[in-house]
A protein has these predicted regions:
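Membrane-embedded alpha-helical bundles that constitute the cytochrome b-like, heme-associated redox core
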Residues: 2-193
Length: 193
């Protein structure tokens, strides 16, 4: 009998491998959680409960997941720099390739800047980070009230920029995959060999 090892770990010329897919979808799911969690925590009175959890829980988890996302962004960048990418999908025109390249640049930049601005805000504001509600992380910058508001504003504005860039990315993929029926999304869909 022939052993089928399943999806390769590394990228192939025509599709992404298991590691690229895992990193891609992990980042997507966690950023989606961050947007939902941020909207709950900023609207929830501290003593109110949602699904049995109070506002502090959502803040602790938002900060903790942000640090996980920063780690995933670093892992993703290292993987991207050390593993060849698949070739461009043949359905992408030169202008579309330029758009994809710019979108990817923005996505990578935002994957780093969002967690960093969030971290700087909570540290400068003196709120700190209780990693997954277990242990307090040290504050290397100390309380800086003069610029915590600026960093918070930047963090929030960049969250909306990230939403726009993600929507543009998803829209382009859906246009190519669903409307034009090119099969483009199959390259990154999980559980596709």
């Amino acid at each position: 009998p022939r052993y089928d090892a399943g999806m390769p770990l590394t990228n192939l010329p025509d599709r992404y491998g298991a590691v690229s897919k895992l990193l891609h979808w992990s980042v997507f799911v966690l950023f989606a959680y961050q947007f939902v969690g941020a909207n709950i925590m900023t609207r929830l009175p501290r003593d109110a409960r949602v699904f049995g959890m109070n506002g502090d829980f959502f803040y602790d988890w938002h900060k903790s997941i942000g640090l996980v996302l920063l780690g995933l962004a670093i892992a993703r960048l290292i993987w991207r720099r050390t593993t060849p990418l698949p070739q461009w999908h043949p359905s992408l025109s030169e202008p579309e390739r330029g758009i994809v390249h710019r979108l990817e640049t923005w996505l990578y930049w935002l994957m780093f800047v969002m967690p960093v601005t969030g971290y700087l805000f909570v540290m400068a504001g003196g709120y700190g980070v209780k990693l997954f509600g277990i242990t307090d992380l040290p504050n290397p910058i100390g309380k800086q009230p003069s610029w915590s508001g600026i960093v918070w504003t930047l963090h929030v504005l960049l969250a909306y920029v990230l939403l726009i860039v993600i929507a543009w990315h998803v829209g382009l993929v859906l246009k190519k995959h669903v409307v034009e029926r090119t099969g483009l999304a199959n390259r990154m869909l999980p559980f596709r060999k």
